A protein has these predicted regions:
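Bacterial N-terminal signal peptides that target proteins for export
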Residues: 1-11
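N-terminal signal peptide c-region/cleavage motif recognized by signal peptidases
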Residues: 17-19
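Noncatalytic luminal/extracellular "stalk/propeptide" segments of secretory-pathway proteins
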Residues: 24-29, 49, 53-220
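N-terminal capping segment at the start of a domain
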Residues: 26-62, 271-273, 349, 428-434, ...
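Soluble metallo-hydrolase cores and metallopeptidase-like ectodomains found primarily
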Residues: 27-30, 107-114, 123-152, 158, ...
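Second-shell loop/turn segments in exported
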Residues: 31-39, 53-63, 119, 130-156, ...
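Acidic/histidine-rich catalytic neighborhood of metal-dependent amide-processing enzymes
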Residues: 174, 234-237, 244, 248, ...
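Active-site-adjacent substrate-binding region
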Residues: 217-233, 239, 246, 250-251, ...
Length: 554
């Protein structure tokens, strides 16, 4: 190669190392202090035990959530944070907490059933016994076809369900488990993840005219091609169908409902919601997910014309009216640029089948630990570092969306607040308890050199992958929606997607201590660097205003 003149070498080197905005130097001594504090003096598993063992699960606005939130506030104050408080974000819905439940087959034989109630269903305060019947009802993702299926179900079963327990859905043998349930990313998988994804044209147009794929893999690929406003429309439309179904079953005098879920097998149940938390919406009958093996047994006995009777009990603590929900906020004040912010967070709420350890007690425990580390080391930081632990994430990013709208801007109008200019970036953790392997740039390629520098001290621990890709389903999207830098870290899968996600196995024992220690060290380093970076972090162009969910889907 022909030698380059010295002046050109210098200019070329400048372009290689200087991103859009000056970048702070990574001090190996500071990183080493962070690692020692994170690995040798860790409290992350203690935090997780309180959040999951003592207070879990943490359904939004439930007594358990509120007790856990008070614990987090006290712990952050103990660590010396400032401005620690519960910040209300609005009216959520009814507080709902299951106090006791049982589901049993009592005829033709006795058998206790492995079942979990779905949130915001109705109670059976005294045990109820009745006949169980199968009423086939297919799970459909196309909202129009889902409405048609509900209409057909009404016509077929109206007047036939009173005083009965119903099995809502046809039995199906669970798929064979041919792949490992616990995995870590391989080098090849990370290399593939680092590549830019295949570009897909966005499907704009009339929501009602979209053609939705029926196969689940094709459906989720199609869903990723939709703008966020259309995804919101889809979600609201399906919720309307579910609420209407619950109303029909209640009006028909159904005693209770058993449902089949493809994830519920091998002794594990998965549970989300049967209805809406809003007090204005109808309350469906007591509704339970039953493991596939037991669900299928019940259906086979009924198919053989042998009557089946079940006994159900469900004691609930439910508020009579809609209640307010809170986020948990705390700060380490900055110095030279104290009016500017770096934020970290993760959702604090969980579903209720397990104890919410990996979703997302782990992320919350890590973020509390990050603040402890930064405060314990008395690291000087120019910008204020703020932690936010969100509620309402599992019901649609409600807590973070409300916070962003209040403090930074409204994605539906793109009217921005003065604080919008003061937030440098937001870093989120919510993909289970796996160690950090890198970060999603969320199409903000100007951030690549920053993360390359900040993650370099953790290359030997596997944090090597920086991908231009987006990732969804969690609270960084609320910031991204108004043009703020928001990032979610790449984490090893472990058994998050196969076993623990929203399941009865989402417990402390499925968290890996060394992985959470590593995550704490990585994020503490990233936050320290971002807080002391000479300039604000680079941003993407502001997005256009996002249409509100259409009136037909509200």
């Amino acid at each position: 190669m022909k030698p380059m003149p010295l002046c050109k070498q210098i200019v070329a080197l400048m372009f290689l190392v200087i991103p859009a905005g000056a970048q702070s130097h990574v001090d190996p001594g500071i990183v080493q202090r962070i690692k020692v504090e994170a690995y040798d003096h860790s409290k992350v598993m203690e935090h997780l035990s309180y959040l999951s063992d003592v207070y879990g699960p943490r359904l939004t606005a439930s007594p358990e959530f509120n007790q856990a939130a008070e614990w987090a506030v006290e712990r952050l104050r103990e660590y010396g944070l400032a401005n620690v408080h519960l910040e209300p974000w609005g009216t959520f819905g009814r507080s709902w907490s299951a106090r006791q439940w049982s589901v049993e087959m009592v005829e033709p034989r006795y058998a206790p059933l492995n079942a979990t109630p779905l949130a915001w269903c109705g109670a059976a305060e005294n045990p109820i016994t009745g006949e169980l019947i199968v009423t086939p009802y297919k799970r459909i993702f196309d909202p129009r076809k889902a409405r048609e299926a509900l209409d057909a179900y009404r016509k077929e079963w109206a007047g036939k369900l009173r005083g009965k327990f119903v099995m809502l859905g046809e039995p199906k043998v669970p798929d064979e488990q041919t792949k490992p349930q616990f995995t870590r990313y391989t080098d090849a998988e990370l290399a593939d993840l680092a590549k830019a994804p295949e570009h897909m044209a966005k499907n704009y147009g009339n929501f009602e005219e979209l053609k939705w794929p029926e196969e689940i893999e094709d459906f989720f690929k199609f869903l990723s091609s939709l703008p966020e406003s259309t995804v919101d429309d889809w979600w609201h439309a399906l919720q309307k169908v579910n609420i209407a179904r619950g109303q029909f079953l209640r009006d028909e005098g159904v005693l209770g409902v058993l449902v089949w879920d493809p994830r519920a097998h091998d002794g594990t149940t998965n549970a989300e919601a049967a209805g809406s938390p809003k007090s204005a919406d109808p309350v469906p009958p007591p509704t339970f997910v039953v493991t596939a093996e037991q669900y299928n047994r019940l259906a086979r006995v009924i198919e053989r014309k042998v009557p089946v009777r079940v006994r159900v009990s469900l004691k609930l603590e439910v508020s009579a009216t809609d209640v307010e929900a809170n986020n948990i906020i705390g700060e380490i004040p900055g110095t030279a640029k104290k009016d500017e912010l770096v934020m970290i967070g993760g959702h604090f709420d969980s579903w209720h089948a397990g104890t919410g350890a990996t979703d997302n007690g782990a992320g919350s425990a890590v973020m509390i630990e990050v603040m402890r580390i930064l405060k314990a080391l008395s690291l000087p930081m120019d910008r204020t570092v703020r932690i936010a632990l969100w509620s309402g994430e599992e019901q649609g990013l409600l807590g973070s969306e409300a916070y962003v709208k209040k403090h930074f801007g409204d994605p539906h109008s793109m009217r921005l607040t003065p604080e919008h200019a003061q937030l440098s970036g937001y870093f989120n953790l919510d993909n289970g308890s796996g160690k950090i392997r890198g970060v999603y740039l969320q199409e903000n390629d100007a951030m690549r050199p920053f993360f390359e520098s900040w993650l370099a001290p953790f290359r030997d621990e596997g944090a090597t992958t920086i991908t231009i890709r987006n990732t969804g389903g969690t609270d960084h999207l609320s910031f991204d929606a108004v043009g703020l830098p928001g990032f979610q870290f790449i984490q090893d899968p472990l058994d998050y997607g196969t076993v623990t996600h929203h399941s009865s196995m989402d417990t402390y024992d499925h968290a890996i201590p060394s992985d959470l220690m590593e995550a704490s060290a990585v994020i503490a380093t990233v936050v320290y660097q971002a807080a002391n970076n000479p300039d604000m972090l680079p941003r993407k162009e502001l997005p256009p205003a996002r249409p509100a969910a259409s009136s037909s889907t509200q």
